[in-house]
Amino acid sequence: MSFEPKNFKATEPKALPVILMLDGSSSMSSNGKIESLNKAVDTMIQKFAEEPRKDMTILVSIIIFGGKGAHVYMEYTPVQKLVAEGFVPLRAAGRTPMGAALTLAKEMIEDKNRTPSRAYRPAVILVSDGEPNDRWEEPMQAFMEGHSAKCQRFAMPIGDEANRSKAIRQFLGEEYIENLYYADEAKDIADAFSRITMSISERVCSRDPNVIAMTRAAAPAAISQQVPKPKVELMPDDLAEEF
């Protein structure tokens, strides 16, 4: 049987989804926090777009919680497209409905039309400068069940109030507590986000991106005082092909 190029279908790159759950409440508008966060997100996208692998595509989605609720600010978008079109900066206003953001993130992860099971294990990043002011406990419990429970999780509390947040620490749990990157103030956001970007990039460059590289977060002080040391944690065999 002769080879027919028209019948040949190239394998599509496998996706590594990255979901950013970002605090867009009014408190983020003070002291340059939202501006610093916008720059950090844009830099993360630029760095992801530089990754050389052709058999993988990094998809970034943004969920913002602020105003009167939470909404999907940006559906999954390939980083190359984001670089070409430009990242639209976030604005800050309103309250801190983190529970609503968790619900949206779970819906996105559980929906196979949006997050296919063939994709690599998603990375979910939670950023906030305070405690949630909605009913977050049930959405948090729901997030820790099903497909969403298998995600790699990071958190970046900004300031003392967020660093004491029960919700942020519950989001990480014991499994990912070392993925807490504390930003004392706006100027520390870029450094914290850079460390998270580096951790995800390590997965991209690894032989098996479903092997999660854990990193030791900096202590709740100036982030630059401590450099994280990598620690490797293997996924269970039954999760190796799909998350």
Task: Report residues per predicted region.
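Surface-exposed acidic, glycine-flexible loop patches that form ligand/cofactor-binding
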Residues: S2, N7-T11, A49-K54, E110-A119, ...
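Von Willebrand factor
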Residues: T11-M74, K81-R121, A123-V127, F154-R169, K187-A192
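A short small-residue
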Residues: V18-S25, L82-P89, E175-Y176
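VWA/integrin I-like adhesion module and closely mimicked acidic/polar interface patches used
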Residues: E35, G130-E174, A183
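Short, well-ordered amphipathic alpha-helices
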Residues: V41-A49, T103-K112, E138-F143
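Extended acidic, low-complexity intrinsically disordered regions
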Residues: G159, D208-F243
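Von Willebrand factor A/integrin I-like adhesion domains
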Residues: D160-A213, A217
